Regions:
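Extracellular/luminal Protease-associated
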Residues: 18, 192-193
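Short, hydrophobic/aliphatic alpha-helical segments
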Residues: 32-43, 190
Length: 193
């Protein structure tokens, strides 16, 4: 096993290269900020790729009466009132933008004959709001996000398992981990993690 160590500095470190991590890294890169994404799995094989059912947003493509407010109400009800209402509001208000971003970046959503994104019922929804790509929605989301991150030249470290956050005076300033394939240690300093 190697005892090599790499030291890296970046403005923003994103830990995780699944859907959320890559989406965050893309947002940072689009604002012209130096970002590094680190994932313990190969970028094409993050857990997002296993999601099959679809992704929810009140687009109104199938049911014009749908809204982010109804999406939020359905989410809170289905959580048995355990979901944080503020978080639910943020997620449901931003869901349409997420779908539109994926669409703009080339995601191959299922479509109706007239070209609208197809949506179906899923879970406890009042309206049809699950957009999908066959039964491989998560894989298509992951492929789309990886392609966009690569287009923006976001550096991605695969197979690096983060074991420790670096903290001083209650401020996180980096992370420490190792490459699972060759043991190389990584010391990553960042202004934001």
């Amino acid at each position: 096993m190697s005892t090599r160590e790499r030291q890296i500095s970046t403005t923003v470190l994103v830990i995780g290269t699944g859907g959320s991590g890559l989406r965050a890294a893309i947002e940072v890169a689009e604002h012209g900020i130096d970002v590094l994404a680190v994932g313990k799995r190969p970028r094409q094989d993050a857990h997002t790729s296993l999601a099959a059912g679809g992704i929810n947003a009140a687009l109104g493509t199938m049911d014009e009466g749908d809204s982010w407010q109804q999406h939020a109400a359905d989410t809170i009800k289905e959580s048995y009132l355990l979901a944080n209402p503020h978080t639910v509001e943020i997620v449901t208000q931003g869901a349409e933008r997420g779908i539109r971003d994926l669409e703009r970046w080339g995601m191959d959503f299922a479509r109706e004959d007239d070209g609208r994104i197809s949506q179906r019922f899923f879970g406890a929804h009042t309206f049809r709001r699950t957009a999908f790509a066959g039964d491989y929605t998560g894989l298509e989301i992951q492929r789309t996000l990886v392609a966009k991150a690569e287009q923006l030249a976001v550096p991605i470290l695969d197979h690096v398992y983060i074991t420790r956050l670096l903290v001083r005076d209650n401020v996180v300033f980096g992370a420490y981990g190792f490459d699972q394939s060759d043991g190389t240690r990584y010391l990553i300093h960042a202004d934001a993690v």
